[in-house]
Design a protein with these regions (language model features):
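C-terminal interaction segment
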Residues: 1-62, 66-112
Length: 112
């Protein structure tokens, strides 16, 4: 993903979704002047969980509507919005809550 601006930093999410409206508005810019509406961060075993959750909160405080934190080693996905955190594990089907409504994927398939 290209970089985006949060209220605090310039960040480069692992995976991000940009709505067609935002593509039309900002598509040619090298750095998005706001957070993406949907962001996924792939968490490595060396990442500090507290830092990962703080980064997700930073995105959510900067116009992002939904953040997926993907923990491949523990086979967990946390889907965070402004008012909830959902946990999906092996055997579950993770689904979007705010953006790309109707998108879902089996956790095991995503982490295969």
């Amino acid at each position: 993903s290209p970089p985006c601006c949060t209220n605090q930093n310039i960040r480069r999410p692992d995976v991000a979704y940009l709505t067609p409206e935002l593509v039309a508005q900002f598509g040619n810019l090298a750095t998005l002047p706001q957070s993406f509406p949907l962001i996924a961060e792939i968490v490595s075993p060396t990442d500090i969980a507290e830092d990962v959750f703080l980064k997700a909160q930073e995105y959510l405080e900067s116009s992002c509507q939904e953040v997926w934190l993907v923990f491949p080693e523990s086979r967990l996905i946390f889907v965070m919005t402004q008012n909830q955190i959902l946990t999906f594990r092996s055997g579950d089907t993770a689904s979007t809550q705010q953006i790309l409504l109707g998108f879902s994927i089996d956790v095991d398939r995503l982490l295969a």
